[in-house]
Curated annotation (Swiss-Prot):
GO terms for biological process: translational elongation. PANTHER family: ELONGATION FACTOR TS, ELONGATION FACTOR TS, MITOCHONDRIAL. This is Elongation factor Ts. The gene is tsf. Keywords: Cytoplasm, Elongation factor, Protein biosynthesis. Pfam families: EF_TS. It comes from Bacillus cereus (strain ATCC 14579 / DSM 31 / CCUG 7414 / JCM 2152 / NBRC 15305 / NCIMB 9373 / NCTC 2599 / NRRL B-3711). The keyword Nucleotide-binding does not apply. The lineage of its organism: Bacteria, Bacillati, Bacillota, Bacilli, Bacillales.
Amino acid sequence: MAITAQMVKELREKTGAGMMDCKKALTETNGDMEKAIDFLREKGIAKAAKKADRIAAEGLTFIETNGNDALILELNSETDFVAKNEGFQTLIKELAAHLLTNKPANVEEAMAQTMENGKKVEEHINEAIAKIGEKLTLRRFEIVSKTDADAFGAYLHMGGRIGVLTVLEGSTDEAAAKDVAMHIAAVNPKYIDRDAVTAEEVEHERQVLTQQALNEGKPEKIVAKMVEGRLGKFFEEICLLDQAFVKNPDMKVRQFVESKGGTLKGFVRYAVGEGIEKREDNFAEEVMNQVKGSN
């Protein structure tokens, strides 16, 4: 297939590799982005591609707690300016309070529910859209529960650009739970621990690291040992409890949590707009199309 400049640009953004290396990788893999990433890694040209999707949408995350229940949600807007609007701030708090009280299973169910003011959630949002003048979208939410013996950790970074909710089991130390939430906001781990990583993902990483070591000219008899060592670093990058704790790099997150007498039951991390890409119009092409259309 034809390799476009946009494909090369995307691969460069994901791997940090040079333009010609990216073009060659895409050519060798017939335009398959994931295989091209593996190709570059096997050649030692690129590190593992970060899974953080491009963030393009605006809005805020918000966390509401009430006793043993907590909620994290994301409300999107078209511009950052509107996300700072008082009407937007009021809306996100109203939605959070309603969702935590009524506990809908998903966004679709939530939109059909009736709020305290007698209006459907969808209608309430539409009224805010009319006042604010921008499209607003309740994108996602998650409700988490705990017992009296546990603690929630709630952290909003940059006023809500990133929101993290943790549950510390067996400890009521909210400050510790929040410290872990701050770490998650900063480092963005993919899993709690190694047990959560699928066998397929581990095997895929092992194959890439093996090929990488062989391409470096390492003797086959020591490759297996090298790969296991590098797999350890791989787990440290993606597994929360294996990571060096941001507030005290001399200890792992696991050690910090255990020092507080608890275990980490789970976490939810939302970054505004992750996975959403705004349409990027090419202004020059747009002008040319208009000119052609007028002929």
